[in-house]
């Protein structure tokens, strides 16, 4: 499996590409799916590569409410769900869903990848804890108390969107808080 991943790794850029097209060309878009390769029980990336990948992902995708689905400097980035239309129809919602929208559930794989790449020492856990505080405040005090919205805008102030109670978002936050009690 690791050998197959080699063709996805961009050595100079320090991250995994999301897509290799049929003609062999690479889609260089920075997306969060690469977190999975470092968040598994048996990670596919080395710790060194995971740390490099996290540096890119955290600088481009990490927000206070989760991870963007596309980096803001990409030409197809949509920072506001539904392209900012007050009454966005299904088409306008769909075209923005994977183009910059923030998904809170991705905080779970991010935490696992960060612990793998940087260990679970007090400094690393403090960094993670500080980045989880906004989503913990959201689940505790905002919207549907005890729940997390499905998505948030990619642009600040990261307005909550989608359904007001998304099980996979809640489950991933509860999972990492259970696995790493020092984060609470």
PLM features: what roles do these ranges have?
Residues 1-73, 78-82, 130, 136-170:
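Catalytic cores of carbohydrate-active enzymes
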Residues 41-54, 114-129, 178-184:
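Structural helix-adjacent loops and short alpha-helical linkers that scaffold large soluble proteins
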Residues 72, 76-124, 174-178:
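C-terminal substrate/ligand-recognition segments
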Residues 113, 117-120, 134-145, 151-154, ...:
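Hydrophobic alpha-helical segments
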